[in-house]
Amino acid sequence: MSIPLYLYGIFPNTIPETLELEGLDKQPVHSQVVDEFCFLYSEARQEKYLASRRNLLTHEKVLEQTMHAGFRVLLPLRFGLVVKDWETIMSQLINPHKDQLNQLFQKLAGKREVSIKIFWDAKAELQTMMESHQDLKQQRDNMEGKKLSMEEVIQIGQLIEINLLARKQAVIEVFSQELNPFAQEIVVSDPMTEEMIYNAAFLIPWESESEFSERVEVIDQKFGDRLRIRYNNFTAPYTFAQLDS
């Protein structure tokens, strides 16, 4: 009976066994060439892996350590992928998607994924916005203590929302104008929290990261304490390595 395999990622070049990596359940990570693709894997000790912080970080660490070793072009596989044998990989992944896998490798060659998440204090922004729009502030203040119709409540709420959205878009536009020219491809995702106003990944030339990072720093200084910027400059290219359904 074959031992199930936990998969981490796919590479266009062979990964030597001299690269020592520790995977999930503290199992050694190996490489296996299937057709023309090199897979990083370890023996699976569980049928299903819990998406705990430790397990997720271990999965990411395997890929990032491989990238640090010089194998920068890769297709990261989703966390928790366990297969029973390599024949399953041939029949379910390589045979139906071989051309697309090669196209993804070509797209990612010489490129890296970086990501930006921008946060602001929603309450502070609302207060600042009201202070800069005295007519809107006066309109809201005049309504305090009064019995309002549903139409009046909706109207003032919409005016506030429109002005906050304009402030948000003005911030995003600064980032877009400065950073978008670096990117071959950009994916903007939905914010994950109320405080997050922008969540984007950029596929940029590998050697452009230092200049990209400097631009982020300049923007950060421009906005000061108004924003919190979370910049990730080293990650496997999950966003740009998606197979079409």
Curated annotation (Swiss-Prot):
InterPro entries recorded: GvpL/GvpF
Pfam families: GvpL_GvpF
Superkingdom in the source lineage: Bacteria
One of the GO BP terms on file: gas vesicle organization
Subcellular location: Gas vesicle
GO cellular component: gas vesicle
UniProt key word GTP-binding: no
Record's keyword terms, sorted: Gas vesicle
Family: Belongs to the gas vesicle GvpF/GvpL family.
Described purpose of this protein according to its UniProt entry: A minor component of the gas vesicle, may be involved in preventing GvpA aggregation during gas vesicle nucleation. Gas vesicles (GV) are hollow, gas filled proteinaceous nanostructures. During planktonic growth they allow positioning of the organism at a favorable depth for light or nutrient acquisition.
Summary of subunit composition and partner proteins: Binds GvpA.
Protein name: Gas vesicle protein F
Gene: gvpF
